[in-house]
Amino acid sequence: DMVPEDLSKIERVTLHDNHNLAAKPASGSAKYDAYIVCPTSGTTIGKIAAGISDNLATRSALVALKERRKLILVPREAPFATAHLEAMAKMSTWGVIILPASPGFYHKPNTIDELIDFVVARILDQLDINHNLSKRWSGEEVDH
């Protein structure tokens, strides 16, 4: 559940058809605070790193880069190929946030939804959007 004061931010999240290159995110004149490609494949990661924009995901990512806006890529691959690791490392030096869809297990999730919430919570943290999808680390010792 989201906290009420942040619902207005979430309402601004828009999903687009990846084949629609006429969509607003394909243009630098569209003012977005951040771009998220979630999930993203190794192929898409490679295309973005190489500057190839053949669909809306790659085009909007390159728009984010040229306009110096926040770009978050959520790779879904496992394991990563060396080519993908090199592309992600390269883009990380450009300021791209690489946030693998890899949930933690230290919070002892009981459901698939809790695993999903963990990843979504990390994305929301990068966007400075308050949430209560996961517990914050308290620094307290826990029994094993």
Language-model features: locations:
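A cross-family phosphate/adenosyl-ligand binding-site feature
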Residues: 1-72, 78-144
